[in-house]
Each structure stands twice: as C-alpha cells, then as structure tokens.
Regions:
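Membrane-proximal helix-loop-helix units in multi-pass membrane proteins
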Residues: 113-173
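Hydrophobic cores of alpha-helical transmembrane segments in multi-pass inner/ER membrane proteins
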Residues: 75-88, 146-158, 204-217
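Membrane-interface helix-boundary motifs at transmembrane edges
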Residues: 27-30, 93-106, 160-171, 221-223
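Transmembrane alpha-helical segments of multi-pass membrane proteins
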Residues: 103-118, 171-182
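Terminal transmembrane helical module of multi-pass membrane proteins
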Residues: 159-223
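N-terminal topogenic module of multi-pass integral membrane proteins
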Residues: 2-98
Length: 223
C-alpha cells in the first residue's frame, strides 16, 4: 500500500464517527422532531401512571415492589420513563439554545447519568432487609434515588439559568419543583416509602417539561 493510500485510509477512519458519537448524533436527530419528543413525553406519563396502579389501587407499593411480580413491565417502565425524560430534556436544551453554559454542560451530564441509573436500577432487583442482602438493597435504592436526583438536577439547571435572567415564569417553575422535592422528602421521612409519594415528583416533572417544551408562554422568542 502506497503512502498516499495509507494517509487516505487514516483520514477516512478519522472521519468515521465512534459509537459514542454515532449515538449522540442519533439523539440529536431525534430531538429535532418536536412531535416525536412530545409523543414520547405523553406516552411516558401515561405508562408511568398506569404502571403505578397495577395491583396497587391505593398506590402503596413503589415501582420497584410492583416490579417484583411484573419484572417485564418494570423494564418497560424504565424504557418509557428513561427515554421520555432523556429525549425531552435534550429537546428543552436545544429549543432554548442552552448548550455552552456551565449549567448546560452540568445538566447534560446529569441527564446521561439519570438515564444510566434508571436502567441500572431495574437490573438490580429490590429486596427487603429481612432478605439478608444489604449490598443489593443499597445498590437498588442508590440507583433509584440517583435516577430521580440526576434528572431533577438537569431540569433545575435549566430553570436556574433562566431564573438568573430574571424570568418570572421560570422562577415560578423552579420554586414549584423545589417545593415538590422538599415535600417528597418530608413525606418519606414521616410515612416511609410509598408509591404515591414516589409518583408526585415524577408527575410534576412531566407537567413542567410539557409546559416548558410545548406551551406558548415558554417558547423562546425568535430574533
């Protein structure tokens, strides 16, 4: 092989995207489609809500406990919840050209970590203290809490950025989300884990994201 051919081959390999680059290019293309992202958000909200009531009319059981008897549905719960939030947070950032700021970079990292944690959570079955598996129990609850914390942090990063620009409507959203998270922690400390308490911040997050992405008052003003 001639030197010119080697250089040409090296140039072609350099231009070929890595698996990581190909994945992010795919996500970037998907988040160009407003209707696609909206459909996922609505589907995620519906599936999350229906799943929470399976054998659980009083919402006493958490998603993890339901997953013990319905493991396949638990995986689908992760798919619908994880993908709908991941796509729509990326859509939110792109819609508002929220890319280069430090908070945007922080939010993007949190979104990826939240996506990873929700799938890690469903692959570590929930156990109780009496089962004698403390490490598994700790790993399951750690990934469950981190999934919620990372996705919440990604939304808060955007709302905080807008609030720093003195946008009243975004400040209201930020305060609403913050109070919801505080309320959840207080209720968990008082009543212990519960499907109803677990669902409240997810429902609020879905509603906030829908308003930010798809309602007229929150659409960015075009120059």
């Amino acid at each position: 092989m001639s030197k010119a051919s080697k250089l040409k081959k090296q140039a072609e390999l350099a231009q070929k995207p890595t698996v990581k680059q190909a994945f992010f290019n795919f996500v970037d293309a998907m988040t160009d489609n407003r209707n696609f992202c909206m459909a996922w958000l609505i589907a995620g909200f519906i599936f999350f809500t229906i799943y929470g009531f399976i054998d659980n009319p009083d919402l006493a059981k958490t998603a993890s406990v339901i997953g013990k008897t319905h493991p396949r549905l638990f995986i689908w719960w992760a798919v619908f919840s994880g993908v709908s939030l991941y796509l729509n947070i990326h859509y939110l950032y792109k819609l508002n050209s929220f890319k280069t700021e430090k908070l945007a970079k922080f939010g993007n990292v949190c979104t990826c970590l939240g996506f990873f944690c929700i799938f890690a959570c469903v692959h570590i079955p929930s156990v109780e203290p009496e089962d004698g598996k403390p490490l598994q129990m700790a790993a399951h609850w750690a990934t469950a809490l981190l999934f919620a914390a990372f996705f919440a942090a990604a939304i808060i990063a955007f709302l905080l950025y807008k609030s720093m620009q003195k946008s009243v409507k975004h400040i209201i959203m930020l305060v609403t989300l913050a109070l919801t998270l505080i309320l959840m922690v207080v209720l968990l400390l008082i009543f212990g884990k519960s499907g109803g308490i677990e669902s409240i911040p997810m429902w609020v997050a879905y509603i906030i994201i829908f308003m930010l992405n798809y309602t007229k008052p929150f659409q960015p003003v075009k120059d």
